[in-house]
From Swiss-Prot:
Pfam families: ABC_tran (PF00005). Part of the ABC transporter complex GltIJKL involved in glutamate and aspartate uptake. Probably responsible for energy coupling to the transport system. PANTHER family: AMINO ACID IMPORT ATP-BINDING PROTEIN, GLUTAMATE_ASPARTATE IMPORT ATP-BINDING PROTEIN GLTL. It catalyses: a polar amino acid(out) + ATP + H2O = a polar amino acid(in) + ADP + phosphate + H(+); L-glutamate(out) + ATP + H2O = L-glutamate(in) + ADP + phosphate + H(+); L-aspartate(out) + ATP + H2O = L-aspartate(in) + ADP + phosphate + H(+). Its EC number is 7.4.2.1. Belongs to the ABC transporter superfamily. It is found in: Cell inner membrane. This is Glutamate/aspartate import ATP-binding protein GltL. It is a peripheral membrane protein. GO terms for molecular function: ATP binding; ATP hydrolysis activity; ATPase-coupled L-glutamate tranmembrane transporter activity. Residues 2-236 form the ABC transporter domain. GO terms for cellular component: ATP-binding cassette (ABC) transporter complex, substrate-binding subunit-containing; membrane. SUPFAM superfamilies: P-loop containing nucleoside triphosphate hydrolases (SSF52540). The lineage of its organism: Bacteria, Pseudomonadati, Pseudomonadota, Gammaproteobacteria, Enterobacterales.
Length: 241
């Protein structure tokens, strides 16, 4: 479903990704973790072309992402992305946030787009807030709206870039619960997160990054119970204290 082969990226002379290779199979949940500045967010943003790469190849469902001929807008309509800071349109109501891309990109009629939006708002527990604006919702509610908005596009995979790191602690679980439900339903997911409880619960594999390299890429039990690298052992000791 998602394949990265020998992916490298530079910002000027600074190399942010070095020879990164991995694969996410259909229905797999892969958690990407590592210290700040390790390249996690950059890696996940290369998957749908938000971050261009200078070397290597990225394919999603057979489409080569970094081929100049690839229609990235079309690809992004099929790969949902949820960001750290929600990225909702502040001037649109919640229901409008959920219907806009369905109508503009997927060319859905307004009535079925609205029906789909309401169904997904109900799924994330927010149907009562359809006519409110983002600023009227808590951070946790806004992030659940962002997940529902991505799901409105019927994505083949979902990418999450630190979806809980901007939230107050008491709001984190309401977002993670939605993500756990998605994982249990078989959604293909790549998740950049420090939430190791979530990783233990639903990840098939864990990728550990440091200094732009994939240091470990292993089944979750192997990663948590028997990490191979000293860097991963050190990271887990700090984060699981």
């Amino acid at each position: 479903m998602i394949t990265l082969k020998n992916v490298s990226k530079w910002y000027g002379h600074f190399q942010v990704l070095t020879d990164c290779s991995t694969e996410v199979k259909k229905g797999e949940v892969v958690v990407v973790c590592g210290p700040s500045g390790s390249g996690k967010s950059t890696l996940i943003k290369t998957v749908n072309g938000l971050e261009p790469v200078q070397q290597g190849e990225i394919t999603v469902d057979g489409i080569v992402v970094n081929d100049k001929k690839t229609d990235l807008a079309k690809l992004r309509s099929r790969v949902g992305m949820v960001f750290q800071h929600f990225e909702l349109f502040p001037h649109l109501s919640i229901i409008e946030n959920l219907t806009l891309a369905q109508v503009k990109v997927l060319k859905r009629d307004k009535a079925p787009a609205r029906e789909k939006a309401l169904k997904l708002l109900e799924r994330v527990g927010l149907s009562a807030h359809a006519n409110k604006f983002p600023a009227q919702l808590s951070g946790g509610q806004q992030q659940r709206v962002a997940i529902a908005r991505a799901l409105c596009m019927d994505p083949i995979a979902m990418l999450f870039d630190e979806p809980t790191s901007a939230l107050d602690p008491e709001m984190i679980n309401e977002v993670l619960d939605v993500m756990v439900e998605l994982a249990n339903e078989g959604m293909t997911m790549m998740v950049v997160t420090h939430e190791m409880g979530f990783a233990r619960k639903v990840a098939n594999r864990v990728i550990f990054m440091d200094e732009g390299k994939i240091v470990e890429d292993s089944p979750k039990d192997a990663f948590f119970d028997d990490p191979k690298s000293d860097r991963a052992k050190d990271f887990l000791a700090k984060i699981l204290h």
